[in-house]
């Protein structure tokens, strides 16, 4: 079985959207919805498939194809892009690095939203930096994602 794995690190944003869910709190600064978890997952998926990164697929800046788009929509576009090129997600995980928001009570809902967007199981965990740095002071949120993909027949989307 030809499995490929990679890691993605999302750009750092003030939070509003995270793991395809709307969170209470400060707004975001980003070209799309600023969903750092979704963006890290996109980078991991594309990198594992050898297809570049989020900027390769969507472009960068306010004029990019991702401008104004929701993280779930961008994830679905990414999976379609992988499928068309003979790859599909097998599993993924996302680690959110932040003191706020607290992920625990919404973790299962976030996992479901991410899993539905990419069509495979996604696990999510969170950690803090114990008050250190911009994530510790609540100025922003970071995320790291790992993704496992496998080759598929583009016409059937079945593993080869």
For each feature predicted by the language model, list its residue ranges.
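Single conserved hydrophobic/aromatic residue that forms the stacking wall/gate
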Residues: 1-13
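Generic structural signal for well-ordered, non-membrane alpha-helical segments
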Residues: 30, 34, 38, 67-71, ...
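Short, conserved loop-to-beta-strand elements that form functional interface hotspots
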Residues: 92-136
